[in-house]
Protein backbone atom coordinates (compact mmCIF):
# COMPACT_ATOMS: atom_id res chain seq x y z
CA UNK A 1 0.00 0.00 0.00
CA UNK A 2 1.05 3.61 -0.45
CA UNK A 3 1.68 5.87 2.57
CA UNK A 4 -1.33 8.20 2.72
CA UNK A 5 -0.58 10.43 5.71
CA UNK A 6 2.97 11.50 4.87
CA UNK A 7 3.10 13.41 1.57
CA UNK A 8 6.91 13.50 1.19
CA UNK A 9 6.99 9.75 1.82
CA UNK A 10 4.15 9.20 -0.65
CA UNK A 11 5.94 11.18 -3.38
CA UNK A 12 9.16 9.31 -2.61
CA UNK A 13 7.43 5.91 -2.77
CA UNK A 14 5.87 6.70 -6.14
CA UNK A 15 9.16 8.03 -7.51
CA UNK A 16 10.91 4.88 -6.28
CA UNK A 17 8.40 2.65 -8.08
CA UNK A 18 8.84 4.62 -11.31
CA UNK A 19 12.63 4.92 -11.07
CA UNK A 20 13.10 1.20 -10.48
CA UNK A 21 10.79 0.51 -13.42
CA UNK A 22 8.26 -1.40 -11.33
CA UNK A 23 5.67 0.63 -13.27
CA UNK A 24 5.91 2.56 -16.54
CA UNK A 25 3.80 5.54 -15.48
CA UNK A 26 1.64 7.09 -12.79
CA UNK A 27 -1.55 5.66 -14.31
CA UNK A 28 -0.27 2.11 -13.81
CA UNK A 29 0.54 2.85 -10.16
CA UNK A 30 -2.91 4.32 -9.59
CA UNK A 31 -4.57 1.32 -11.23
CA UNK A 32 -2.52 -1.16 -9.19
CA UNK A 33 -3.14 0.58 -5.86
CA UNK A 34 -6.76 1.53 -6.70
CA UNK A 35 -6.03 5.25 -6.39
CA UNK A 36 -7.78 8.06 -8.24
CA UNK A 37 -4.99 9.84 -10.12
CA UNK A 38 -6.61 13.28 -9.95
CA UNK A 39 -7.13 12.97 -6.18
CA UNK A 40 -3.58 11.70 -5.68
CA UNK A 41 -2.10 14.56 -7.69
CA UNK A 42 -4.31 17.09 -5.88
CA UNK A 43 -3.28 15.78 -2.46
CA UNK A 44 0.41 15.93 -3.40
CA UNK A 45 0.02 19.37 -5.03
CA UNK A 46 -1.39 20.71 -1.77
CA UNK A 47 1.87 19.55 -0.15
CA UNK A 48 3.95 21.30 -2.82
CA UNK A 49 4.62 18.41 -5.20
CA UNK A 50 3.84 18.37 -8.91
CA UNK A 51 4.05 15.45 -11.31
CA UNK A 52 6.38 15.82 -14.28
CA UNK A 53 5.23 13.65 -17.20
CA UNK A 54 8.57 14.28 -18.90
CA UNK A 55 10.63 13.15 -15.92
CA UNK A 56 8.06 10.58 -14.75
CA UNK A 57 8.33 11.68 -11.14
CA UNK A 58 6.99 14.04 -8.51
CA UNK A 59 9.13 17.13 -7.97
Task: For each feature predicted by the language model, list its residue ranges.
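Short acidic, Pro/Gly- and aromatic-enriched capping/linker segments at domain boundaries
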Residues: 35-50
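Short alpha-helical "recognition helix" segments of helix-turn-helix
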Residues: 29-30
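Short, acidic, Ser/Thr-enriched surface-loop or helix-capping motifs
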Residues: 53
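Helix-turn-helix DNA-binding elements, focusing on the entry/boundary residues of the two helices
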Residues: 26
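Functionally constrained cores in energy, signaling, and assembly domains
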Residues: 11, 33-35
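N-terminal acidic leader/helix
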Residues: 1-23
Amino acid sequence: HLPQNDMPMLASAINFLLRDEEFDNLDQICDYYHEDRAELEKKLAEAGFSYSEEQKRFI
